[in-house]
Structure formats: structure tokens, C-alpha cells
């Protein structure tokens, strides 16, 4: 039986990292993506089931390229968990519109880019 595979974005910290370690410890192939390649490598070094795939989710083309790399390595992808996010908490009077645009670029559009990268693959798996 083939090992199951999960792709996790935002896999270098927080919920993404915790899920990566949990799935890897349960024997899954885990592809983790995030911007900070050094953190991805540190996590991958802790468990042979974890493979790093550096990615900035704000880059639509790169999202598709990385998903292709993951498919080529593991053949099948069972779950995608998109937990990429950024936040810089501030008092209302200190909020800068440029910073808020960056938050939306990563948190919203980055998730949309990730979904669009896998959409065709998962739709091809649907059988009625």
C-alpha cells in the first residue's frame, strides 16, 4: 500500500509545523513549504518523512511549479493543508495600509494561489 502524502504550506512554524511533525510521525510523506528555507531544512532534518519545498505563495507560477515538484516526488497527493499566514499586530492608529496589503497578499491571495495550483489535480480525481 502506498504511503499517504500531505502538502502543508506555512510549514515552518505554528500550526503548519505541528501538523507536519504529527503526520510525519504517523508515517505519512510530508511536503512542507514556506519562505524560510533554513527553517524548512531544520524541520526536515528531524524526520525522514518530511521533505522541504521552499515557496512564496504570493507567486502564482511558483505555486504551480512547487506542486508539480511534489507530485513528481510522491506521485499522489492525498491532502493539502494551506496554513500560510502573516500578521503584524498593531494598534489601530499605527496600522499602515501597505502592511495590510501585504497581509492580504499572503493570507488571502496566497491561499487562492495555492488552491489554484492543486485544483486541476484534485478535480481529475473525482469519479461519479
Give the location of each predicted region:
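Conserved glycine-rich cofactor-binding loop
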Residues: 12-13
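Conserved glycine-rich Rossmann-like NAD(P)H-binding loop of the short-chain dehydrogenase/reductase
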Residues: 26-43
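The beta1-alpha1 cofactor-binding region of Rossmann-like NAD(H)/NADP(H)-dependent oxidoreductases
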Residues: 55-65, 97
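Hydrophobic positions on the long internal alpha-helix
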Residues: 81, 114-118
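Conserved NAD(P)H cofactor-binding loop of Rossmann-fold oxidoreductase domains
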Residues: 83-88
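Substrate-binding pocket helix/loop in short-chain dehydrogenase/reductase
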Residues: 91-92, 96-104
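Conserved small/polar residues in nucleotide/adenosyl-binding loops
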Residues: 126-128
Amino acid at each position: 500500500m502506498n504511503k499517504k502524502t500531505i502538502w502543508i504550506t506555512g510549514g515552518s512554524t505554528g500550526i503548519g509545523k505541528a501538523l507536519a511533525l504529527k503526520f510525519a510521525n504517523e508515517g505519512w510523506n510530508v511536503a512542507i513549504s514556506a519562505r524560510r528555507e533554513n527553517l524548512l531544512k531544520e524541520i526536515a532534518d528531524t524526520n525522514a518523512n518530511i521533505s522541504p519545498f521552499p515557496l512564496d505563495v504570493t507567486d502564482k507560477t511558483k505555486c504551480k511549479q512547487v506542486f508539480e515538484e511534489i507530485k513528481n516526488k510522491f506521485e499522489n497527493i492525498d491532502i493539502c493543508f494551506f496554513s500560510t499566514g502573516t500578521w503584524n499586530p498593531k494598534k489601530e492608529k499605527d496600522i499602515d495600509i501597505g502592511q495590510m496589503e501585504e497581509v492580504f497578499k499572503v493570507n488571502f491571495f496566497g491561499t487562492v494561489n495555492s488552491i489554484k495550483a492543486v485544483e486541476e489535480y484534485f478535480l481529475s480525481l473525482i469519479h461519479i
